[in-house]
From Swiss-Prot:
Record protein name field: Virulence factor-related M protein
Biological process terms in GO annotation: phagocytosis
Pfam families registered for this protein in UniProt: Gram_pos_anchor (PF00746), M (PF02370), YSIRK_signal (PF04650)
GO cellular component terms, A-Z: extracellular region
Higher taxonomy: Bacteria, Bacillati, Bacillota, Bacilli, Lactobacillales
Modified residues (Pentaglycyl murein peptidoglycan amidated threonine): T339
Membrane topology of this protein: Peptidoglycan-anchor
Chief localisation class: secreted
C repeats: 120-154, 162-196, 211-246
Keywords, alphabetical: Cell wall, Coiled coil, Peptidoglycan-anchor, Phagocytosis, Repeat, Secreted, Signal, Virulence
Mapped D repeat ranges: 272-277, 278-283, 286-291, 293-298
UniProt subcellular location: Secreted, Cell wall
Length: 369
């Protein structure tokens, strides 16, 4: 654009120079014509020869031609001046356009710089976006791997939770069975104590009767001594029998007391063991519940905890057991724990021994289980 503007300026200067040259030439030519006309007029006045007249006519014609040429040149000069004015206007217009073009060029240069800056910024942002996309892809892969690992861990925890729930149910059933056996053992002890008290009372009555017979024996005559002797022997036999039964009852009561001590000790140990297991199970269940909650939060799932279903089943099972337990206990109270025979406060020593043995065996089985 600058080069074209320079060419236009040079053309305008050249046009101005040519126009000035034409004007100078016309001025000189007009002065020459005037001088020739004056000289020729003086010659005509001095001579009147035909030759001079012919020359005069020729010069006149030439002068007329030159004047015509001058008119043409003046007209051409005016046209050139008009062209010069038009060219000057065109020049001004072109200069204004050049200024406008310069503004446009500067604006375009500025826009070009802005575009370069925008392009550089967009390129940098594209690079950052590409790096961010790659980072997000890596994070997504890592998140998927972590999700798979968490799902596997969740399944493992669910399996462990199920096992712990089942173990807790078995432990609860064992504890309830042991409690029932202990209640049966206590009922048997009460019955043995009642029997012991009755035997003790009978023994004291027989002992008093025997002492009375011993005291009354010298008072009776000899003929009735045989009957008294028989009564005394019968009393002694009854006393021996009662004493034997009392001894057996004492032995059974001692055995029951010993078994009760063992049962209490085993019960305490088993209860402590069950309490420790229950506490460990509760802690593990709480820990697993917390881990399950974290897993559910990470998975953004609103499903219920699977571990609560076995708990609901356990509660319903406990409720059913609680509902059926009174009738079972009622039936057990009217029967012996080992033989199933009808309970009798005066049952035999063999039945008591079998009952105590059955209670001990049941306790050992519970402990082994």
């Amino acid at each position: 654009m600058a080069r074209q503007q320079t060419k236009k300026n040079y053309s305008l200067r050249k046009l101005k120079t040519g126009t000035a040259s034409v004007a100078v030439a016309l001025t000189v030519l007009g002065a020459g014509f005037a001088n020739q006309t004056e000289v020729r007029a003086e010659g005509v006045n001095a001579t009147t020869s035909l030759t001079e007249k012919a020359k005069y006519d020729a010069l006149k014609d030439e002068n007329t031609g030159l004047r015509g040429d001058q008119t043409k040149l003046v007209k051409k000069l005016e046209e050139e001046q008009e062209k010069s004015k038009n060219l000057e206007k065109e020049k001004q217009k072109l200069e204004n356009q050049a200024l406008n073009f310069q503004d446009v060029i500067e604006t375009q240069e500025k826009e070009k710089e802005d575009l370069k800056t925008t392009l550089a910024k967009a390129t940098k942002e594209n690079e950052i976006s590409e790096a961010s996309r790659k980072g997000l892809s890596r994070d997504l892969e890592a998140s998927r791997a972590a999700k798979k690992e968490l799902e596997a861990k969740h399944q493992k925890l669910e399996a462990e939770n199920k096992k712990l729930t089942e173990a807790n149910q078995v432990s609860e059933a064992s504890r309830k069975g042991l409690s029932n056996d202990l209640e049966a053992s206590r009922a048997a002890k009460k019955e043995l104590e009642a029997k012991y008290q009755k035997l003790e009372t009978d023994h004291q009555a027989l002992e008093a009767k025997h002492q009375k017979l011993e005291a009354d024996l010298p008072k009776f005559q000899r003929p009735s001594r045989k009957g008294l002797s028989r009564d005394l022997e019968a009393s002694r036999e009854a006393n021996k029998k009662v004493t034997s039964e009392l001894t057996q009852a004492k032995a059974q009561l001692s055995a029951l007391e010993e078994s009760k001590k063992l049962s209490e000790k085993e019960k305490a140990e088993l209860q402590a063991k069950l309490d420790a297991q229950g506490k460990a199970l509760k802690e593990q269940l709480a820990k697993q519940t917390e881990e399950l909650a974290k897993l559910r939060a990470e998975k953004a799932a609103g499903s219920k905890t699977p571990a609560t279903k076995p708990a609901n089943k356990e509660r319903s099972g406990r409720a059913a057991q609680t509902a059926t337990r009174p009738s079972q206990n009622k039936g057990m109270r009217s029967q012996l724990p080992s033989t199933g025979e009808a309970a009798n406060p005066f049952f035999t020593a063999a039945a008591a021994t079998v009952m105590v043995s059955a209670g001990m065996l049941a306790l050992k089985r519970k402990e082994e289980n």
